[in-house]
UniProtKB/Swiss-Prot annotation:
One of its GO terms (cellular component) is mitochondrial inner membrane. One of its GO terms (molecular function) is ATP:ADP antiporter activity. It is found in: Mitochondrion inner membrane. It comes from Drosophila melanogaster (Fruit fly). This is ADP,ATP carrier protein. The lineage of its organism: Eukaryota, Metazoa, Ecdysozoa, Arthropoda, Hexapoda. The gene is sesB. The chain crosses the membrane at residues 23-52, 90-114, 125-145, 193-213, 225-245, 288-305. The transmembrane helices are not perpendicular to the plane of the membrane, but cross the membrane at an angle. Odd-numbered transmembrane helices exhibit a sharp kink, due to the presence of a conserved proline residue.
Length: 312
């Protein structure tokens, strides 16, 4: 009973200590920096997605598939127009604003739970594990709320049609069409493997970044180039480690809206097995180099977030 009472008292105290202003600042700083960076790297993002899903796209025949990142960059403006590089970007910004903002905001709240009373100087491994846990939990929580928008972004970016040949005319049309054909399940296809991937990615993304910065003598006054270097390494490593999960979830997303006879993967496990068997393990990393370049935007988000918080 004593432990239960102590737990309740601790939770009550945490509720009273909740900083509403700080929460809003976290939300605003994370959202603004994310929206700016995602728009800047949108062309790379679209190339990466096309390389990931073209193998099962109904719009891209085997002889029309992109040979690689450079080929994709050259052909997109020729075949679909220059502005098509930003196809799906609006959905991405709308999705990314709450996603990143919630990630950053809840990350700090989870840190209160996992890192309360932990001394980083004398309890390094507990501090490290707490950062991993808070980062992973924040990412998974956010994903539950915004997955349909992530789904729509993927389908819009994968749409290679031009004019009347496009599969979807926009965000609303995409969500409506899939909901009518597949129901809410269609909008959450690939959710399971997404949660697995997001936990791995966010755990590394936030965990290693916060741990590295926490080990610096004066984290708040760290030169921006050092913060940038740390962020760049973190986003690259996290992206490569979780990339196969991302490829599988994108492939699963591409199946929504298809007739039963056109469905390629029975479930997530079948998707993993089929890709490995038919395309080889290298297929799990298609577009990975584009993802590393895109990671520059992710590193920019982390650094810009810290800078905006200083202003706010």
């Amino acid at each position: 009973m004593g432990n239960i009472s102590a737990s309740i008292t601790s939770q009550s105290k945490m509720g009273k200590d909740f900083d509403a202003v700080g929460f809003v600042k976290d939300f605003a700083a994370g959202g603004i920096s994310a929206a700016v960076s995602k728009t800047a790297v949108a062309p790379i993002e679209r190339v990466k997605l096309l390389l990931q899903v073209q193998h099962i796209s109904k719009q891209i025949s085997p002889d029309k598939q992109y040979k690689g990142m450079v080929d994709c960059f050259i052909r997109i403006p020729k075949e679909q127009g220059f502005s098509s590089f930003w196809r799906g970007n609006l959905a991405n910004v709308i999705r990314y604003f709450p996603t990143q903002a919630l990630n950053f905001a809840f990350k700090d709240k989870y840190k209160q739970v996992f890192l309360g009373g932990v001394d980083k100087n004398t309890q390094f491994w507990r501090y490290f594990a707490g950062n991993l846990a808070s980062g992973g939990a924040a990412g998974a929580t956010s994903l539950c709320f915004v997955y349909p928008l992530d789904f729509a972004r993927t389908r819009l970016a994968a749409d290679t049609g031009k004019g009347g040949q496009r599969e979807f005319t926009g965000l609303g049309n995409c969500l409506t069409k899939i909901f009518k054909s597949d129901g809410i399940v269609g909008l959450y296809r690939g959710f399971g493997v997404s949660v697995q991937g997001i936990i791995i990615y966010r755990a590394a993304y936030f965990g290693f970044y916060d741990t590295a910065r926490g080990m610096l003598p004066d984290p708040k006054n760290t030169p921006i180039y050092i913060s940038w270097a740390i962020a760049q390494v973190v986003t690259t490593v996290a992206g490569i480690v979780s990339y196969p999960f991302d490829t599988v979830r994108r492939r699963m997303m591409m199946q929504s809206g298809r007739k039963a006879t056109e469905v390629i993967y029975k479930n997530t496990l079948h998707c993993w097995a089929t890709i490995a068997k038919q395309e080889g393990t290298g297929a799990f990393f298609k577009g990975a180099f584009s993802n590393i370049l895109r990671g520059t935007g992710g590193a920019f988000v982390l650094v810009l977030y810290d800078e905006i918080k200083k202003v706010l």
